[in-house]
Design a protein with these regions (language model features):
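Active-site beta-strand-loop-beta-strand hairpin of nuclease catalytic cores
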Residues: 37-55
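Catalytic cores of nucleic-acid endonucleases
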Residues: 53, 60-117
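Acidic-residue sensor for enzyme active/binding pockets
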Residues: 11, 55-57
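Acidic-basic catalytic patches of nuclease active cores, encompassing PD-(D/E)XK
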Residues: 1-37, 48
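Anionic group-transfer/hydrolysis microenvironments
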Residues: 30, 45, 57-59
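Short, flexible, glycine/charge-rich loop motifs used to bind or transfer phosphoryl groups or to couple energy/partner
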Residues: 34-35, 45-46, 71-75
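Non-catalytic C-terminal interaction segments of nucleic acid-processing enzymes
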Residues: 2-3, 12-17, 100-197
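Short, solvent-exposed polar/charged micro-motifs at secondary-structure junctions
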Residues: 34-39, 124-127
Length: 197
């Protein structure tokens, strides 16, 4: 791993950055159903108050980042306005170089930018790297929309519902772990009480 931060820590930092109290922020969404506007697994989806959809692929290592380009689909659905990779800060230059290479070889691929996080979970949003027209050795960075389609109310609700389902499943896991720990504590008490002195 190129970070010591857990996936959950990164998700919480992203949710805060994208103002989860104002916008709909959901994680690990698998697109299915007539009203869900994505047809693949998404690490993070953000629906803005104005109805636009942002997809974020979260990567914790360089190998994980490279694996993304082995997927058969690199083109994003028309429903996604912004598409970002979220990576450890120290991978920034290598990632931009790789994205330039992928764009050269695959004209269907596009992205809006890179979101960087450091070990303190500070989030920085960087735009898509564009070579300067006047000075080929220089770059500019823009947050590049890849589509401009707003979501319908039914689509927003479908994504929010998937987020709620995911939350309930996660809470169930926590309860199961707590119950397992409670059973383990009881087992420890039995072992201690059986211990002859």
């Amino acid at each position: 791993m190129d970070t010591n931060r857990s996936l959950y820590e990164i998700e919480v930092a992203l949710a805060k950055h994208f103002e989860y109290l104002k916008n709909i922020v959901v994680f690990n969404v698998v697109g299915w159903g007539a009203d869900v506007p994505v047809e693949h697994e998404c690490d993070c989806l953000v629906i803005s108050k104005s109805g636009y959809l942002t997809e974020i692929e979260i990567k914790r290592s360089w190998a994980d980042f490279l694996n993304d380009f082995k997927k058969t689909h690199l083109k994003r659905e028309d429903s996604i306005k912004y598409f970002y990779y979220c990576i450890p800060e120290k991978l920034s230059e290598k990632a931009y170089d790789k994205l330039d290479e992928v764009i050269e070889s695959n004209k269907d691929f596009d992205y809006s930018g890179i979101i960087l996080y450091d070990e303190n979970l500070n989030i920085t949003v960087g735009g898509k790297r564009i070579k300067s027209f006047f000075d080929p050795g220089k770059y500019s960075y823009i947050n590049n929309p890849i589509h401009y389609n707003k979501l319908y109310l039914e689509q927003k609700l479908a994504i929010a519902r998937l987020g709620c389902i995911k939350t309930i499943k996660e809470k169930k896991k926590i309860i199961d772990l707590q119950n397992k720990d409670a059973i383990s504590d009881v087992d420890d008490e039995l072992l201690i009480s059986d211990d002859p002195e």
